[in-house]
Design a protein with these regions (language model features):
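Tryptophan-anchored aromatic micro-motifs
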Residues: 36-54, 152-177, 212-213
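Hydrophilic extracytoplasmic domains
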Residues: 28-29, 218, 228-273
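N-terminal glycine/threonine-rich, aromatic-flanked beta-hairpin/loop signature
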Residues: 55-102, 176-228
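Residue-level recognition of beta-strand termini and adjacent short loop/turns
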Residues: 66, 121-123, 188, 241-243
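Bacterial Sec-dependent N-terminal signal peptides
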Residues: 1, 15-42, 143-158, 265-273
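Edge beta-strand at a domain terminus
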Residues: 133-165, 209-214, 251-273
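An anionic, turn-rich surface loop/hairpin at beta-sheet edges
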Residues: 102-119, 220-239
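Bacterial N-terminal signal peptides that target proteins for export
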Residues: 1-9
Length: 273
């Protein structure tokens, strides 16, 4: 798990810069496809690292829009043991040479990150790659990892469909409840409101928070909020679907022993008076 934390942290470093370069590396040469840049167009999410599933908290979304431009969305907080990052479609420059991609980031005058992807297979729904990452600080290697990674393509984008007021109808997995006492109202500006029932059974906005923000990229939902005099908190979910007035989220979570479990949360849209 720590290995992926390092990968996610390094990926976040990319988002602090817009330097994307390509190199030729003859390690494990393959010919996964012609016109790689064209096949990459769209949104992609990492789902397996070295054959192990990636938990939702550590996922991100890469969006390739051309042969020279890409975006990345990722949320990492201090509780994950890494640098705090909140990037909603951070623009990146992209260069591709054959089946090789190398991401190079000079995040500051001391730190350089080089991330290499040697793509071994790609089709319309997934791609796999041999992956190397090296982070140096003042010329000294601080991190080096190698492994295999699999991305799957996201076919839907729920940024517009999530706008509105939603009431939670139940949570399963890890903990289960159905008290009908949670509402979230998502706005187009990337903020949201949280509602609870008061003692009289009336819906009341929670006003003890300094801020509440979210973003959706494809089906990846990230939220963050901060209560007065408390640390910032975050959540990560994957939107399964939004169909008319029904919405479902899922998330793969990790236990302290490294095992995983899935959570499912169902929502119903509320039409405001």
């Amino acid at each position: 798990m720590k290995k992926f934390l390092s990968w996610a942290f390094a990926a976040a470093l990319i988002c602090s810069s817009t330097v994307f370069t390509s190199c030729v590396n003859e390690d494990n040469p393959v010919n996964p496809a012609d016109n790689l840049a064209e096949k990459l167009i769209g949104k992609w999410m990492p789902v397996y690292l070295d054959g192990n599933p990636v938990v939702t908290d550590l996922k991100s979304v890469y969006t390739f829009v051309s042969a020279t431009k890409a975006y990345m969305s990722v949320s990492i907080n201090a509780q994950q043991g890494e640098e705090i990052v909140w990037n909603n479609q951070k623009e990146l420059d992209l260069s591709i040479n054959g089946n090789k991609m190398t991401l190079t980031n000079h995040s500051d005058e001391h730190t350089t990150m080089v991330e290499e992807f040697n793509i071994t297979a790609i089709d319309g729904s997934a791609f796999t790659a041999n992956h190397k990452i090296t982070v140096t600080v003042d010329g000294s290697v601080m991190l080096h990892n190698e492994g295999t990674i699999r991305f799957e393509k996201l076919t839907r984008d729920y940024r517009e469909a999530i706008i509105g007021l939603w009431e939670c109808k139940g949570l399963k997995g890890g903990e289960t409840y159905n008290d009908g006492n949670d509402r979230l109202e998502f706005f187009e500006d990337g903020t949201y409101k949280y509602w609870r029932k008061n003692d009289a059974g009336e819906w009341e906005e929670v006003t003890t928070r300094e801020f509440q923000e979210y973003f959706v990229d494809g089906g990846f939902l990230c939220t963050r909020w901060k209560n007065v005099d408390e640390d910032e908190l975050r959540e990560w979910w994957e939107i399964v679907n939004i169909k008319r007035d029904k919405m479902q989220w899922k998330a793969l979570r990790a236990n302290e022993d490294g095992s995983t479990f899935e959570q499912i949360m169902d929502w119903e849209k509320i039409e405001e008076d």
